Amino acid sequence: MKIVVIGGGAAGMMFSTQYKKANPEDEVILFEKSSYVAWAGCPTPYFIADELKKSDVLHGTPEDFIKRGINVKIHHEVTKIDFENKTLTVKGNEINGIISYDKLVIAVGAKSFVPNIAGYSQNLENVFTLSHAEHAFKIKDFLNENKPKLKNAVVVGAGFIGLEMAESFRKNGLNVTLIE
């Protein structure tokens, strides 16, 4: 049986690992559009605050999971799903085209909600969303590169991650405004 998983975050990697362990003869292919798999999102703010190491939030490399028999394809984006014919259109550095599957798991995770704010652009250098490993690395790099001149941070969203990010910014010496 050919199992295809879309999304290499915690859920996608956990499913792939457990499924392959229980069904070693089945083929498991996992597509992740970024460079990272097995990202633990919940402790992200503590990583940004330098309380955790990168290895505490990245629980393996693609190579680690390939050794377990999971065919991990990073930098691959699924652009179309044909449920009727059980095919996917994939765009990536190794696979470009249509592949078939027997069973499909969609584990793409959450996407940050950005309210309609006049003047907002995803290209603003000091405005970030946080829903993936790459976002966390950008925030951490920005803080480290600009620490002396940063004074204030605004966090939009008072869920667990938002509150923990507010705490992380305070630990980085910033005044924080939390908006819910």
What are these regions (language model features)?
Residues 13-14, 160-164:
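Glycine-rich nucleophile elbow surrounding the catalytic serine of serine-hydrolase chemistry
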Residues 1-4, 61-154, 177:
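FAD-binding core/adjacent interface of flavoenzyme oxidoreductases
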Residues 17-23, 37-38, 91-98, 153-159:
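Short, mixed-charge, low-aromatic patches
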Residues 33, 109-110, 158:
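Flexible loop residues that form catalytic
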